[in-house]
Structures are given as structure tokens and as C-alpha cells.
Amino acid sequence: MIIKEILAELETKDHPVAKPLYKKEGIKILMLGFKKGMILKEHKAHVPTKLVVLEGKVIYKSEAVEIELEKYDEFEIPVNDLHAVNATEDTVCMLIQG
């Protein structure tokens, strides 16, 4: 029920909501929810990470690339790449780390 929890929390939040879906040694799966216009501020991924858009649309932006990702798109986030994610629609994403 993680995605439902995220969607419920988004009703009262002004920032993206993240919750772990799965965690085991060497791998972690996080679910992220955004309302349209929300921004995940600049940060770095310190381990290999894949961003998968399950619903909605986001813009992944770093110094090296700016790419629009929509439903079912996936993107390999380079390790230590300073980036931000901007939701252009209400969005649910999955982050696979490890």
C-alpha cells in the first residue's frame, strides 16, 4: 500500500514524498510521489540508480543533461551527478538503487 500512502500524504505536502518499498543488502527500491510543480532539489546519487516513471511526467536536470521522462520511461542516474527532478504533471516514480 506504499503508493496509496504516498498519494494520501501528497494531499497535505508541498514537497515530494518518498517511501521505501524494498530494502535488502546491496539494493533499495524507493517510491517517489510528486504533485505537478514539485521539485526534488539538487542532490547526488552515491550508488548506481535507475529512475522509472510509473505515472506522470518529470524533467531530470543536471549540468550534463536535461531530459523529459514520462510514463514507463527509465533513466540511469550517473553516480555523483548533481541533479534535480521537476514534476510537470502529478507523478509516481520508482528509484532502484544498488
Which residues does each predicted region cover?
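Short acidic-glycine-tyrosine-enriched beta hairpin
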Residues: A64-V79
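A short, compositionally biased micro-patch
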Residues: K24, K35, H46, V53, ...
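A short, N-terminal "cap"/entry segment at the start of jelly-roll beta-barrel domains
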Residues: M1-G26, K61
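Glycine- and acidic-residue-biased ligand/ion/polar-headgroup-sensing regions
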Residues: V47-V58, E63
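Conserved short histidine dyad/triad with adjacent acidic residue
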Residues: H15, K28-A45, V79
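Ligand-binding loop in jelly-roll beta-barrel domains
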Residues: V79-G98
